[in-house]
Structure formats: structure tokens, C-alpha cells
Regions:
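Tandem CBS (Bateman) regulatory domains
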Residues: 1-13, 52-83, 87-97, 117-141
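A glycine-centered beta-loop-beta connector
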Residues: 30-33, 38-54, 95, 103-119
Length: 141
């Protein structure tokens, strides 16, 4: 059931950050758009890291000037990523084992092609399992 490629369910319109942006800029963007994390890309669109609200919180605890620091100084560069051809089942395992909420999807050149979320996998599973639309009232007892 989870043998389809992640490219079939991933989100392709992704808000990103650049390493030279300030943490303050990105914090405002994340608050405005209610985001918990952003992929960080270079100007060719290659994934170079990930910045999360936790990364920013951790940094502001030790750096009083955290808002003016650059994303590249705060971001996590050890990022688990998937390829567009990877299976939805692989993504599901990562979400369960690592408790990720979002995983970047990159091509062979490292360019960001999209992200897949745990919600994408849940929605995919429900649509495969139940051919008819699921209504909230049908789930609640």
C-alpha cells in the first residue's frame, strides 16, 4: 500500500530560508506562516540545512544577539532527506522511528524539490484505505 513514490504526495511549494538571512527575519516568517521549521537552501536551490523553532530557541538562550545572527550559524546541517523516487513507506518509517514532522525531498543534485509531512502520509493512507471521503462525523462516536 505504501509503494508509491513520495513525489506523488509531497508538497512542492515550500517556504525556504537562505543561510545569510537573519534569525529575526526567519522567526517573523515562521510566526506569520505558523511554521515550525524551514529548509535552508543556497541560491541554486540546493538544500544546505534546516532551521527549526527549537534551533532558534536554543540559540537565543545562549546568545543575547540571536535575532541578528545568521541562519547559517544556527541551522542544522545534518538533515535526513528523501529522494522523489523513495517510497511513501520509507517516509512513514522515518516519521514513526525518528518522530519527524517534515522531511525535505531533494533530487540527485541536492536541489530541494519539496517536503513530505507526516500529515501527507496519514492523508495518503486514509485515502487508500477508504475509497469514499471520510467525514469527521463518521469518525466521532
Amino acid at each position: 500500500m505504501m509503494n508509491e513514490a513520495v513525489r506523488t504526495i509531497m508538497t512542492t511549494e515550500v517556504v525556504t530560508a537562505y543561510p545569510e538571512q537573519t534569525v529575526g527575519e526567519i522567526a517573523e516568517l515562521m510566526l506569520r506562516d505558523q511554521l515550525q521549521q524551514l529548509p535552508v537552501v543556497d541560491h541554486e536551490g540546493r538544500l544546505v540545512g534546516l532551521i527549526t523553532s527549537y534551533d532558534m530557541w536554543r540559540d537565543c538562550r545562549v546568545n543575547p544577539d540571536s535575532e541578528s545572527r545568521l541562519v547559517g550559524e544556527v541551522m542544522n546541517t545534518r538533515v535526513i532527506k528523501l529522494a522523489p523516487k523513495d517510497k511513501v513507506g520509507t517516509a512513514a518509517e522515518l516519521f514513526m522511528d525518528r518522530r519527524f514532522k517534515t522531511i525535505p525531498v531533494v533530487n540527485l543534485n541536492g536541489k530541494l524539490k519539496g517536503v513530505i509531512t507526516a500529515f501527507d502520509v496519514i492523508r495518503y493512507t486514509l485515502r487508500k484505505e477508504y475509497k469514499e471521503p471520510i467525514l469527521f462525523r463518521d469518525v466521532i462516536l
